[in-house]
Amino acid sequence: MEKKKGVRGKIILECTGCVRNSHNRVSKGVSRYITQKNRHNTPNRLELKKFCPRCYKHIIHGEIKK
């Protein structure tokens, strides 16, 4: 039997600093985190302040489309 797909879905958070400063960064790549959110309680895009190992500081990570 299959599991029911609930309101909780997986989302990807991407570093906003790495995306904006892609032309002059020291390391290549973009920092991403995978997490879950309840789509009924939080219908808007999620933004969390998390540590970016590429920027070496805490910076806002925003939700991206899959």
Curated annotation (Swiss-Prot):
An annotated GO cellular component of this protein is: ribosome
Out of the domains of life, which is the source? Eukaryota
Q: Where in the cell is it found?
A: Plastid
This protein's UniProt keywords: Plastid, Ribonucleoprotein, Ribosomal protein
Under InterPro entries, the record lists:
Ribosomal_bL33 (IPR001705), Ribosomal_bL33_CS (IPR018264), Ribosomal_bL33_sf (IPR038584), Ribosomal_zn-bd (IPR011332)
One of its GO biological process terms is: translation
Q: Which GO terms describe its molecular function?
A: structural constituent of ribosome
* PANTHER family on file: 50S RIBOSOMAL PROTEIN L33, CHLOROPLASTIC, LARGE RIBOSOMAL SUBUNIT PROTEIN BL33C
**Family, per entry:** Belongs to the bacterial ribosomal protein bL33 family.
State what protein this is by name.
Large ribosomal subunit protein bL33c
The species this protein belongs to is Cuscuta gronovii (Common dodder)
